[in-house]
Each structure stands twice: as C-alpha cells, then as structure tokens.
Amino acid sequence: MKAFMDKEFMLQSPVAQHLYHTYAADMPICDYHCHISPKEIYENRRFENIAQVWLGGRQPDGSLAGDHYKWRVMRSNGVPEEYITGTKPDRERFQKFAEALPMCVGNPMYHWCHLELRKFFGYQGVLNGDTAEEVWNLCNDKLQHDDSMTVRGLIEQSNVAFIGTTDDPIDDLAWHKKIKEDPSIKFTVAPSFRPDKAINIQKPGFAEYMGKLAQVVGKEKLECINCVTDALTQRIEFFAEMGCRASDHGLDYVPYREATKEEVNAIYQKAMAGEAVTAEEAEKYQTYILIHLGKQYHRLNIAMQLHYNCLRGVNRKMNALLGPDTGFDMINTAKCGGEIAALLSALNDTDECPKVIIYSLNPADNEQIGTILGCFQSTEVPGKIQHGSAWWFNDQKIGMENQMKSLANLGLLGNFVGMLTDSRSFLSYTRHDYFRRILCNLIGQWVEDGEYPDDEKALEKIVKGICFDNAKRYFAL
C-alpha cells in the first residue's frame, strides 16, 4: 500500500516520476485566468486565520467572496448556511469544514486542501474534526507571523510568474496601475477584459450598466450601436495599455445569428428603452458585439477566452439570498458547436480571428471542441485555437485526463497552454502541482506502454511546454 500523498503522489510509473521531478515540479506558473483581488496583492494582505483564506465570507462592501467549491462541500454535509456564508465565528466555520472534509473521498478538494497544508504550512497530518484545533493554531501562527505568508509571499513561494485577473470594462484598473509601478513586485499582474454585462442585452440591469460604460468613456449616454462598439474599443485599448493579455467571456452558450448594423441598432434602442428583447434579437446583438470584439482582440494581440455551458443560479431561493457565484451553478447541455465555428469563420473571413481558448463546462463537448480547433489554426502561434484546461467541475483527475486525452486524440497536446486556477484563493497555486502530476502520469504511462518513445529531449520539451513555456509564448510574456 502506498503512503498517503507521498512525494510520488499520483505518479504511478518510473517514467512519470522522472518527468515530474526532473522537468515539471520546478517550472514557473502562468496563472492566466483567475479571480483573485489585485487590491489584496498591492496591499500585500495578511490573513488573520485559515478560515479567511479558505472559506472567505462577507466583504467590507457587503458582497460575498470565497471558495464556493468548499461552500458546496459544507452544504453537502448538512452544514447550516450560517457557518458557510453567515456570521458564525471563523473558528466554528473552520471546524465545520474540517468535519466535512473526510467525506470528500475521491474528491479533488481532499487533495487540494492537503497539498496546501503541506506546501504552505508544513503540516504532514490529516485534517478532520479531531485535528482541526491543531491545524487552526499552526496555520494561524504562520499566517500572522511569517513574512512569507502575506499575499505576495504566497505568490512568490509558489513561483508564479504571471497572474491574469478578471476585470470589468468599467474598472479603472487603479490597483493594477499601482502594482505595475511598484518595483518590489517581481511577478506580473495583468487585467483580463470581461465584458459580459455589455453583451448580455437580455438580462436585467443592461441599460443601467451601459449608462455606467458611457460615463467611463466621457459620454452622457451611448446613443447608438456605433457608440457601443466605440466605447468597448476605447476600453479594450486602455486594458491593452495596462498589459492585458486575454479577454474572457462567460456565456450561457455561444450564439451566432447574423444581422445588419441597422437591425442591431434597433435591438439596442429597444433594450435601452426598457423593452424586453426576444432570444433571437439578443443573439443578433451578441453576435455583432462578439465579432467586433474579436477583431479588436486580434489587432491588439489579446487572446479571446470563451467559457460556456454553465447554468447559473439554479436554486432561485438561495441565489436571491446570496447572489451569483455562491455555489448554485450546474453543467448545462446547450448545443452550440456550429455557432462557435461560425463565429470563428466570420472572424477568419477578414483575417481578424484572434487567439481563442474554448472551454465548455460540459465534458460531453470535449470531442466537438477538439474538432473545431483544427479548422482554424494558423501560422501566428502554434496552437492558436486552444481547447481550454478542464474547467470548474471538471478540474479533477478524471476531468483533466479526459480533456488531455481528447486534445491528444484530435489535436496537439504538445502545444497545450496548460493549467489555470480559476480561483479566488491565494493558496490555490498547488492546483498547478496537482495538474502537473496528472500530466506526467498520463504521458509517463504512454511511454511505459510503448505508445510514445522514451525520447528525453522530446519529453522535456512537451512537459515544460505544457507546464509553462507554451503559455509564455501564447500570451507573449
């Protein structure tokens, strides 16, 4: 029997162990998509306790922020909401999480937590209800007194070279500017352009948001569709000046429905007048804006990330109580492969297709995405159109293996830009280590089985590429 999470954790062959320890383990991290706070990076926040880091909670502005993976674990163990997002003391909240964790057998949360405890806190034991007090005291002592345990310290000891945050077009990026001007910050932090609120014409709050966008670009209001595209272009250019390498689109599904500018303008005027738009009208507007944005991304060398097939806020009662991104989302089954291809084809018609990374929350879409990739590659960069890393509910061993196997079967795994945390926690960089172990085990098994040669030079290039080098090239770091 193997020891629990020893140095060969998840590395099931000699080749896998060699690839991981020789090439993967010490590579820098490019965390090109996450949800961490640039303010906390600049201010070099020091957390008071492990519950603040792991469980989050109410923020000073009244919003909720935290790891909703952990919140779902607690809810699934019958923990009352007052211990999850409520006002119970942090020590009690941590106790409830520790009591739930042993139930996570086979769940990546169990591995992630123990990887974090070992790497950052030197704890070699097992977290459960009985050890919670010991772990609480150990972690809090380090968080409060160890200079390497501030936000910047955690990033630096994780060997992170690049962080791509997620930012709204109306954000002034003041914290990014401060980070950029601070010579003591050795890693790069760049904004990512997330214009969902300007695209979701069918959702409540659209007209109000467009009013805010108008103010940011110095207008009283955005009177027509040309004004909208001009405003978005102005904001993209500002983001590019601040070092933006990627955009991100969180879509229910990827639409494609052609329309003239006049049609789209009429739809926009209708929405701004407070009238409801039909699903068909929304798709026409969204398609028009996505094509415009894609062309701007191409011009400015910004990658376009498409996240889709998530059905959000399905528990109406809890979503109304706590708001979005609090753990009430699920995998959707929208079929939009043809629309994705049509969008890329429209951009390709004028040689203005940007680098694109496609993520579906539904793993049933893996093979479809894999076949789309090969239709739109070009000489601009190897792997210009990417199948994004196993996302959200799929960033576990089976999901990661399936995504990489699908990519290997239908495209070039060797050009994959690799892992991202998509996280709100500064301890989550261990997920890159988790991914690297799974990657090396997968490739190592192919070598052990005689399906790929034991070619040291080729294997080094592939492993280092997927761990960091491909992302460095892709995002022009």
Residues covered by each model-derived region:
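Hard-cation-handling environments
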Residues: 310, 315
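Metal-cofactor-binding active-site regions of metalloenzymes
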Residues: 2-300, 352-354, 358-370, 374-477
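C-terminal amphipathic alpha-helical interaction region
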Residues: 304-306
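Short glycine/proline- and charge-enriched loop/turn segments
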Residues: 319-327
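A short acidic, glycine-rich active-site loop
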Residues: 279, 328-334
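Short, basic/hydrophobic alpha-helical segments
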Residues: 343-349
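Divalent-cation-assisted or electrostatically stabilized phosphate/pyrophosphate-binding catalytic cores
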Residues: 334-340
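Short secondary-structure transition/capping segments
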Residues: 43-44, 317-319
